[in-house]
């Protein structure tokens, strides 16, 4: 039995009270679903700026009515300290996912990104400290590595940030570290590497590449690749991220606390490889033989050419073991979008 399997069993036997910020978002709704499956009580905070009611509705269809009754939703904003205080009351564990999470968005509107990602983060840290929560796990980002050339990326080696978004996520780490040293506060940062999976928004100017390409191919629309397609990423399926959050929040090992960890698979896939995995995967699911080819555009400002994580640290300290590689994660993701796209995204 893995450490994560043992933890899931333990949580069912001794339920806790959790707060998820950004609960109506892609990752937040995934965490909500898993915690409700485990019969936990979950408080969710969201202002629907980038999250969606239909994500919460979809979670509701996947859990029992009894499990759903353990979910308490607060429509609020992390930029308002009183909302953060209300959400943190009587909470054991905080999973802070709320943020404006787009490099292009941050280049277009750095002030809004700073407000949500730094001011909002500090509000949540302070409210959680004052509420004496057991732990505060927050979404950090692989963008923190910036222009550092080394591959794979190791937590202790970072470069200069390449976007306002990257600046905000690094500032999160600095604040968490100061709170840990100044207030004996338990915070763990998770540097996510290109997370994908069910409920990830395929629409809009700032959509991630995997859901956008899936929806476009389902609608027989052209696929655009920024650059020549050799750009590569360490794509990480949502279930791996959920595992990392729960292991981080509940660890009792002092040596593992107040650290930052990469959350990824530890491998990389080029955009060209990704395109054909998605196209051919959809062909299998739909019993079709599409041979559509991508259209190449200019490289996108603020992006790094290659990204791959070293996951030795999180495996060592938290016993994290990614259960889904890119192929298995895509298999699950494609099935979800094929089943759901006509009802959730048909109007776009």
From Swiss-Prot:
It catalyses: UDP-2-acetamido-2-deoxy-alpha-D-glucuronate = UDP-2-acetamido-2-deoxy-alpha-D-galacturonate; UDP-N-acetyl-alpha-D-glucosamine = UDP-N-acetyl-alpha-D-galactosamine. Its EC number is 5.1.3.45, 5.1.3.7. The keyword Lipoprotein does not apply. Optimum pH is 8.8 (with UDP-GlcNAcA or UDP-GalNAcA as substrate). NAD(+) binds at residues 26-27, 46, 50-51, 77-78, 97, 165, 169, 195. InterPro entries: Epimerase_deHydtase (IPR001509), Lipid_A_modif_metabolic_enz (IPR050177), NAD(P)-bd_dom_sf (IPR036291). Keywords: Capsule biogenesis/degradation, Isomerase, NAD, Nucleotide-binding. GO terms for biological process: capsule polysaccharide biosynthetic process. Its cofactor is NAD(+). It comes from the Bacteria. Pathway: Capsule biogenesis; capsule polysaccharide biosynthesis; Glycan metabolism; Vi-antigen biosynthesis. It is an enzyme of class 5 (isomerase). Homodimer. Epimerase required for the biosynthesis of the capsular polysaccharide, commonly referred as the Vi antigen, an important virulence factor. Catalyzes the reversible epimerization of UDP-N-acetylglucosaminuronic acid (UDP-GlcNAcA) to UDP-N-acetylgalactosaminuronic acid (UDP-GalNAcA). Also catalyzes, with lower efficiency, the reversible epimerization of UDP-N-acetylglucosamine (UDP-GlcNAc) to UDP-N-acetylgalactosamine (UDP-GalNAc). Cannot use UDP-glucose (UDP-Glc) and UDP-galactose (UDP-Gal) as substrates. This is UDP-N-acetyl-alpha-D-glucosaminouronate 4-epimerase. It comes from Salmonella typhi.
């Amino acid at each position: 039995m893995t450490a994560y399997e043992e933890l899931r069993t333990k949580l069912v036997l001794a339920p806790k009270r959790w707060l998820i910020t950004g609960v109506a978002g892609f990752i937040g709704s995934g965490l909500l679903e898993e915690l409700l499956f485990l019969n936990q009580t979950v408080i969710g905070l969201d202002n629907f700026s980038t999250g969606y009611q239909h994500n919460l509705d979809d979670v509701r269809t996947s859990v029992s009515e009894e499990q759903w009754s353990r979910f308490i939703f607060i429509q609020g904003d992390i930029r308002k300290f009183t909302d953060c205080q209300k959400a943190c009351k009587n909470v054991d564990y905080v999973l802070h996912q709320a943020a404006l999470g787009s490099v292009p968005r941050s280049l277009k509107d750095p002030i809004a990104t700073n407000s949500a990602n730094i001011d909002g983060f500090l509000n949540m840290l302070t409210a959680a400290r004052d509420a004496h929560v057991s732990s505060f796990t927050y979404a950090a980002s692989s963008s923190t590595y910036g222009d550092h050339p080394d591959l794979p990326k190791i937590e202790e080696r970072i470069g200069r940030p390449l976007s306002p978004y990257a600046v905000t996520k690094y500032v999160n780490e600095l604040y968490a570290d100061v709170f840990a040293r100044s207030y004996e506060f338990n915070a763990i940062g998770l540097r996510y590497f290109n997370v994908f999976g069910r409920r990830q928004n395929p629409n809009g100017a700032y959509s991630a590449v995997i859901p956008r390409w899936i929806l476009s191919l389902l609608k027989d629309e052209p696929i655009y690749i920024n650059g020549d397609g050799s750009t590569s990423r360490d794509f990480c399926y949502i279930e791996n991220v959920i595992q990392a959050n729960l292991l981080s929040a509940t660890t009792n090992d002092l040596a593992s606390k107040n650290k930052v960890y990469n959350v990824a698979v530890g491998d990389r896939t080029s955009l060209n490889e990704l395109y054909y995995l998605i196209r051919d995967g959809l062909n299998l699911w739909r019993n079709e033989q599409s041979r559509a080819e991508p259209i190449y555009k200019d490289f996108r400002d603020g992006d790094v050419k290659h990204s791959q994580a070293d996951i030795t640290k999180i495996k060592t300290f938290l016993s994290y073991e990614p259960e889904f590689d890119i192929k298995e994660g895509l298999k699950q993701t494609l099935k979800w979008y094929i089943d759901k796209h006509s009802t959730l995204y048909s109007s776009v």
